[in-house]
Amino acid sequence: MNPTLTESQTLTPTIQLGKVYVETYGCQMNEYDSGIVKELFRKEHYETTNVVEESDIIFLNTCAVRENAHAKIYGRLQSLGYLKKKNPNLVIGVLGCMAQNLGEDLFHQELPLDLIVGPDNYRTLPELIQNIRNGEKDVQLTRLSRSETYDELEPKVVNGIQAFVTIMRGCNNFCTFCVVPYTRGRERSREPKSIIHEIKQLQEMGVKQVTLLGQNVNSYSYESYDFCALVESILKETTIERVRFTSPHPKDFPDHLISLMAKEDRFSSQIHMPLQAGSSKVLRDMKRSYTKEEYLDLVKKIQSVIPDIGITSDIIVGFPGETEEEFLETLEVVKKVKFDMSYMFKYSEREGTIAKRKFIDDVPEEVKSRRLIELVELQTKISLEKNTSKIGKIFSILIENTSKKSKQELCGRSHCGRMVVFPIPEGMSQDLSDWIGKTVNVLIEQATSATLKGKLIV
């Protein structure tokens, strides 16, 4: 006798339409977008895979911020040619900012490529794949949207106890060096209730810390909600242990955001605050909307309210027209602020940007390289000094994983974003699951420019 089928059961098994492989380049937003793509295909009965050789569809989710990002993708596409020869039905697509930036020009590069889709068009991907399987060639869709936020998809981009949650997309600032407004469109924000629902689901999966993402995260605006109101709602309506955010713009940093960071223990006291340059003239040419003095005043205000704040930054050297004196101004700002860490780059001209149209890339490459070396050396020295000053102090650490160098060492971050490594004490559990996600106190005993090392306080 056959058992009775319930309403949720079906006589026909789900047919898998193929295996999808997604490779991600660039920022945390791209990591989140790759999660959106996987979720879209899962809903359409595709399987996702981490093995490129067994895939039926390969997507490269790309970045367009720097020139070497393009070179990486060209090289990667060429390396995938052998799979296309083995399986002519394999579909290879380029997604993301490079797809949006270069569009159909990618089809003229003699690459094994079937599909080009920009960040605002991912909902169409399953349909576009079907069109390709029906014989359509060189499929491209790169329309920008003023409304798409993928609100209901909630891809759950989880790394252990941490997760990213995109709260807004796009950028309205049009910094002259930046391609993002042209590849991701204008700013639009997700509904607060959708964001909070996603965080609650992440909590149920064991996530302890979420990082709120946006190209200009603190310019979040949805009806009556600004960024502070959103964070307050998250802290009130969830029990998530830590809330971080990246990347803010200095022009959108009101006093009540600083007060909220000082007041709320669960709101991480760490800020990634892009400087980009230390000269007001260069900042004006970059269209950054603040002067050197305004940036320094903001940092001084933040540090006065939150003395142990962790501040990191982005800095570009060799922007068109940057003189030696203007570069020295950048070094002076770095010395005054004493960033915990910085991402430092040589200026590279990007197709489609205002700087490409308006300025001549006139700083010689050897000068850019020398300035970058000087800046990196200064930042490394400051990072070491700051970390060395923490020796003898005790920090509350949220354990994330084992350290890269040893399975007998655990690592995690302090409330201010500092990476701390410490050994598992003898006689205590060596089972990683007993440690991950726990908050412990660690006494700092050693320091490098990147890491604090210590021992567990039992």
UniProtKB/Swiss-Prot annotation:
Localization, UniProt: Cytoplasm
Reaction(s) catalysed by this chain's protein: N(6)-dimethylallyladenosine(37) in tRNA + (sulfur carrier)-SH + AH2 + 2 S-adenosyl-L-methionine = 2-methylsulfanyl-N(6)-dimethylallyladenosine(37) in tRNA + (sulfur carrier)-H + 5'-deoxyadenosine + L-methionine + A + S-adenosyl-L-homocysteine + 2 H(+)
Binding site for [4Fe-4S] cluster 2: 171, 175, 178
Bound cofactor: record note: Binds 2 [4Fe-4S] clusters. One cluster is coordinated with 3 cysteines and an exchangeable S-adenosyl-L-methionine.
UniProt keyword annotations, A-Z: 4Fe-4S, Cytoplasm, Iron, Iron-sulfur, Metal-binding, S-adenosyl-L-methionine, Transferase, tRNA processing
Radical SAM core domain mapped to chain residues: 157-385
EC number: 2.8.4.3
GO CC terms, sorted: cytosol
EC class (word): transferase
Domain TRAM stretches: 388-458
Main location: cytoplasm
Swiss-Prot/TrEMBL cofactor(s): [4Fe-4S] cluster
Binding annotation for [4Fe-4S] cluster 1: 27, 63, 97
Span of domain MTTase N-terminal: 18-134
Pfam family, one: Radical_SAM
Protein origin, superkingdom: Bacteria
GO molecular function: 4 iron, 4 sulfur cluster binding; metal ion binding; N6-isopentenyladenosine methylthiotransferase activity
Family note: Belongs to the methylthiotransferase family. MiaB subfamily.
Function: Catalyzes the methylthiolation of N6-(dimethylallyl)adenosine (i(6)A), leading to the formation of 2-methylthio-N6-(dimethylallyl)adenosine (ms(2)i(6)A) at position 37 in tRNAs that read codons beginning with uridine.
HAMAP family for this protein: tRNA_metthiotr_MiaB (MF_01864)
Quaternary organization: Monomer.
Protein name (database record): tRNA-2-methylthio-N(6)-dimethylallyladenosine synthase
Organism: Leptospira biflexa serovar Patoc (strain Patoc 1 / ATCC 23582 / Paris)
Gene: miaB
